[in-house]
Amino acid sequence: MKISILFVALIALACPIANAADSHSAPITEKSFKCITDMTHVRHFYVDNLNGNLKETVRVASSDKGEPYPVGSVLQLVPTEVMVKREKGFNPTTKDWEFFELDVSKTGSTIRTRGFVEVSNRFGGNCFNCHVKARPEFDLVCDVTHGCDPIPITRAMSGALQRTDPRCEHKTPISDEDAAALTQLGAIVKAINAAKPPTQ
């Protein structure tokens, strides 16, 4: 009986500690980001959880109904753009998501910029301005049926970027299909950059 009481007491003490850990995001550095295909594939994007709560992140990402993501969730469609769910109250405007724009190479990741409503990607789009259009139940996460505006890259292009992430160990050469998709993407980026007003 004494052993059972002690066991219950230890569990009761451990639960608040576990809950506290789940409610605070781990420190985020360049080492927090890795080869995109080493993350968990959900439909056409990849997810992870910096707090170790990957099962819950995958469950929410796989749901069609929409609900808040757990703290520590990492979402990526392409290697250079990341969303990380921070602790509750970190930034109410972005529903506690922090946006990251990365440079990636064989040696790893470098954070080009990070923040909230001010972060833009290399295609010229403001991350928050796109994601804020997602319907409320989808926790600021875009998909083709979530209410966000269409993005200028196709599934073939995002897939090619995922499969050619330089941080990954590539054991096969780039396919003709991926090479063609990347060429098309390069033309789109060139056109977007050409349409930008000249900097003063």
Walk through the language-model features, giving the residues of each.
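Positively charged n-region of N-terminal signal peptides that target proteins for export
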Residues: 1-5
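Bacterial N-terminal signal peptides
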Residues: 6-14
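Generic detector of short alpha-helix boundary/capping microenvironments
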Residues: 8, 60-61, 118
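Short linear sequence elements within intrinsically disordered, low-complexity coil regions
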Residues: 12, 50-51, 102-105
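Sec/Tat signal peptide C-region and signal peptidase I cleavage site
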Residues: 15-20
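Sequence context surrounding c-type heme c attachment/ligation sites in exported
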Residues: 22-36, 41-44, 66-200
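N-terminal post-signal-peptidase region of extra-cytosolic proteins
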Residues: 51-66
